[in-house]
């Protein structure tokens, strides 16, 4: 039985970080440290099998999209900070319960309006800049908002926890656009659609997690849903997989599967196929082996790890940082608040190192990354030959599993 890589929430606060280097508590010092981190010669501790020892792989989380108007988990306006009782739906609950799916899709229906209005911010576009200059070779993201693909489609990006832009049928495995699914939900739930129009579309900006909104009863979550306490979730309807409805699959015992819908095409209890699920890794669900292997290879092929906007609370992300550390890779972390097990990543650094061996800072990624890119561009224009620092082996990179999955 495959071990489930749980997205463990760690709702409690993590210990505060120790800023590294010590002068990186100022914006100027932090930019200098990150510049040194990205331009330093490859670590001598790296194993001989590293494909591109001068390259950097990025590992990103919900904090990166806060400036886009989305919620994170543990920031000052994060889900776990403002709503201590928050509990996500688990994969086994989604599979087993028609009522649980009604609640999930009702909340997702409201949350999709927020996500649709939002888009990449300056941090995402700065990552494009790092890629264009040759500093970033690939991105591993825990985020499901697709902002990386919009901001830098040419930079290989592995979506570790999937994405919200599509759904997958649990029976026939066909995929459906989330935009098309949203239109169907509006048709099946006209009262909810009117509520959505009045409450969300009439606003100029996306709903954000604030104390005021929590008082009103609204709260947004990083995985793209909105909680409205007291809402009649049991009245919500969601469609069956259109492919399964037209061509019911055979069950394992050789009988044709049963799929019942109401007069409008909504899935009815008693059906045993045709359940649509978001193309994300839910809490308690296993990450696909090919995605797990591609993430490991992205780490193994690079010489540095830059962690952005994540506390690494999920095991699937933390294990990648741990893998990088075990392989002798320098690690830099930009995140507000503590990071899971971060003392293990930095305990062996020399006190007088200036960032080349590791960096730990607390700044908004939307603030520091654009200035980091500007500083690197200024150094480039001053005559520094980055090709002596960056030496990517393009032909070998074309053959790695990350590229295979993304192609």
Where are these regions (language model features)?
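Conserved catalytic core of sirtuin-type NAD+-dependent deacylases
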Residues: 1-407
